[in-house]
């Protein structure tokens, strides 16, 4: 019985830590860039775009396709960085727990 109570306490502790981690991640702002800094996309920790900055030199009619590609690339860069931060925070939180490889948290 004592083991079950101890385990329940650990579960509640883990839940509180997970909620704190999720709040920290949601508050993050991550920049992704492309074109050597000509395009910058800022995402929040949930992956929502907060801002987009484009160097005025890209506003030429024949450069529209390039601009579109750079925006997509900057967004991907920011999203990849956000996912890496989330994965690292999750690894730190779950260190030592027997969680199967590839299982994404929170469930």
Curated annotation (Swiss-Prot):
**What Gene Ontology terms describe what this protein does at the molecular function level?**
DNA binding
Q: Name one GO cellular component term.
A: bacterial nucleoid
Q: What is this protein called?
A: Nucleoid-associated protein R00231
Q: Where in the cell is it found?
A: Cytoplasm, Nucleoid
Subunit arrangement? Homodimer.
Q: What keyword terms does UniProt attach to this protein?
A: Cytoplasm, DNA-binding
Q: Which SUPFAM superfamilies match?
A: YbaB-like (SSF82607)
> What does the UniProt record say this protein does?
Binds to DNA and alters its conformation. May be involved in regulation of gene expression, nucleoid organization and DNA protection.
Q: Which NCBIfam families match?
A: DNA_YbaB_EbfC
Q: Indicate whether NADP appears among the record's keywords.
A: no
Family as reported in the entry's similarity comment = Belongs to the YbaB/EbfC family.
InterPro entries attached here? YbaB-like_sf, YbaB/EbfC
């Amino acid at each position: 019985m004592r083991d079950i109570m101890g385990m329940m306490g650990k579960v509640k502790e883990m839940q509180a830590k997970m909620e704190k981690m999720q709040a920290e991640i949601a508050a993050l702002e991550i920049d992704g860039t492309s074109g050597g800094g000509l395009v910058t996309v800022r995402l929040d920790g949930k992956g929502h775009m907060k801002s987009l900055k484009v160097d005025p030199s890209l506003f030429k009619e024949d450069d529209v396709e390039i601009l579109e590609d750079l925006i997509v690339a900057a967004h991907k860069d920011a999203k990849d960085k956000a996912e890496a931060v989330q994965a690292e925070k999750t690894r730190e939180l779950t260190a030592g727990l027997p969680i199967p490889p590839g299982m994404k948290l929170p469930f």
